[in-house]
């Protein structure tokens, strides 16, 4: 079903031959599989039976399912008749991943544009999605390769929209929507480490190595005006003691790969610095993405260790009391013997 406020995601009306597109399976016929091209306002296309799989087809329902989305490649386009022939079997796993990535970005842009059009519309003036696409979205695709990259960049550089015919109220709603929809999601990265140094100044050596490691992460960040970094800010890496010799290295990042790479670098710096002081670093758990469950497990572990430490202190005091009682018991028989004399 095509809604009044719907519009294709790209400027050209039809895809080009050899272009990867994302489709939804609509029905299965005698000649092939009928699909709708999601990026092109759901226009119809067909995957011929011979283009579904490289293998012999025994049951077509096992290869395609109505309602499922698939990445396919355009084989032929007849713009006069509106025919679009597609192939599923010619798409490699790498191309499939590329198509999915582009579609998810395009879908995010489309959702933002539709929402902005709805917010700007009134009873007297309906703003159509295509109107916004024509004014600035399609030109952004041309300039930045993908409008998603331009939208994401505008969060820190609003000047991205300079030069486009965008009214002030349109720009305000657009920026608010982009910030709400595309604001980076935090990814927490953690590594579990054992750090030891038995030299005379071992504690100072560990402190120095930790500081050097944390400063490595800060070196690539833009310092705030007051010069103080919030440990929860993106890119800041902190190292905390759980219980000697166990430490955890934690950082929050806007991109997973960037976070894993930076924490890995900080581990290397820490290892290098502590080795210089005749210390040792053992990686108990390599840098990885962690969530709320992992955080809770860490808190539980720290609480357990704290309780064990307290119990240990209490047992030492009890042992001291027992020793005193034993001494008193040993003294009492001696007093009795002396009284008999």
From Swiss-Prot:
Q: What S-S linkages are listed for this chain? A: none
Q: Where in the cell is it found?
A: Cytoplasm, Cytosol
Q: Sorted alphabetically, which SMART domains does this protein's record hold?
A: S1
Q: Name one GO biological process term.
A: regulation of translation
Classify the source by domain of life. Answer: Eukaryota
Pfam families assigned to the protein according to its UniProt record, in alphabetical order: EIF_2_alpha (PF07541), S1 (PF00575)
Return the Basic and acidic residues bias intervals. 331-341
All copies of the S1 motif domain together span 18-89
GO cellular component terms given for this protein = cytosol; eukaryotic 48S preinitiation complex; eukaryotic translation initiation factor 2 complex
Molecular-function annotations in GO: ribosome binding; RNA binding; translation initiation factor activity
User: Which UniProt key words apply to this protein?
Assistant: Cytoplasm, Initiation factor, Protein biosynthesis, RNA-binding, Translation regulation
Disordered, as annotated region: 301-341
Q: Where is the composition biased (Acidic residues)?
A: 303-330
Is Cell membrane set as a keyword in this record? no
What InterPro entries does the record point to?
Answer: NA-bd_OB-fold, S1_domain, S1_IF2_alpha, TIF2_asu_C, TIF2_asu_middle_sf, TIF_2_asu
Q: What the protein does?
A: eIF-2 functions in the early steps of protein synthesis by forming a ternary complex with GTP and initiator tRNA. This complex binds to a 40S ribosomal subunit, followed by mRNA binding to form a 43S pre-initiation complex. Junction of the 60S ribosomal subunit to form the 80S initiation complex is preceded by hydrolysis of the GTP bound to eIF-2 and release of an eIF-2-GDP binary complex. In order for eIF-2 to recycle and catalyze another round of initiation, the GDP bound to eIF-2 must exchange with GTP by way of a reaction catalyzed by eIF2B.
Family indicated by similarity: Belongs to the eIF-2-alpha family.
Q: How does it assemble?
A: Eukaryotic translation initiation factor 2 eIF2 is a heterotrimeric complex composed of an alpha, a beta and a gamma subunit.
Q: What name goes with this protein?
A: Eukaryotic translation initiation factor 2 subunit 1
Q: Which organism is it from?
A: Dictyostelium discoideum
């Amino acid at each position: 079903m095509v809604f009044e406020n719907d519009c294709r995601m790209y400027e050209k009306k039809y895809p080009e031959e050899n272009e990867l597109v994302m489709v939804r399976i609509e029905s299965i016929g005698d000649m092939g599989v009928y699909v709708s091209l999601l990026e092109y306002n759901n226009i119809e296309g067909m995957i011929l039976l011979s283009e579904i799989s490289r293998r012999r087809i025994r049951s077509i329902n096992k290869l395609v399912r109505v309602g499922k989305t698939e990445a396919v490649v355009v084989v032929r386009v007849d713009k006069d008749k509106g025919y679009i022939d597609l192939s599923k079997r010619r798409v490699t796993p790498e191309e499939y991943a590329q198509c999915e990535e582009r579609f998810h970005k395009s879908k995010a842009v489309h959702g933002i544009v539709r929402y902005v059009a709805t917010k700007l519309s009134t009873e007297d003036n309906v703003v159509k999605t295509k109107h916004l696409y024509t004014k600035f979205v399609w030109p952004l695709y041309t300039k930045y390769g993908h409008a998603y990259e331009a939208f994401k960049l505008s969060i820190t550089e609003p000047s991205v929209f300079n030069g486009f015919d965008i009214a002030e109220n349109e720009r305000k709603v657009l920026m608010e929507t982009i910030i709400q929809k595309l604001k980076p999601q935090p990814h927490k990265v953690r590594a579990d480490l054992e750090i030891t140094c038995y030299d005379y100044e071992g504690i100072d050596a560990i402190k120095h190595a930790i500081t050097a490691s944390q400063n490595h992460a800060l070196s690539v960040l833009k310092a705030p005006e007051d010069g103080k970094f919030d440990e929860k800010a993106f890119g800041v890496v902190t190292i905390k003691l759980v219980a000697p010799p166990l430490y955890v290295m934690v950082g929050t990042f806007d991109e997973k790969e960037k976070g894993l790479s930076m924490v890995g670098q900080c581990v290397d710096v820490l290892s290098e610095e502590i080795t210089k002081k005749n210390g040792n670093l053992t990686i108990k758990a390599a840098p990885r993405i962690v969530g709320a469950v992992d955080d809770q497990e860490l808190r539980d572990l720290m609480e357990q260790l704290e309780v064990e430490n307290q119990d240990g202190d209490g047992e030492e005091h009890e042992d001291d009391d027992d020793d005193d009682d034993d001494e008193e018991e040993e003294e009492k028989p001696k007093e009795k013997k002396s009284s008999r004399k």
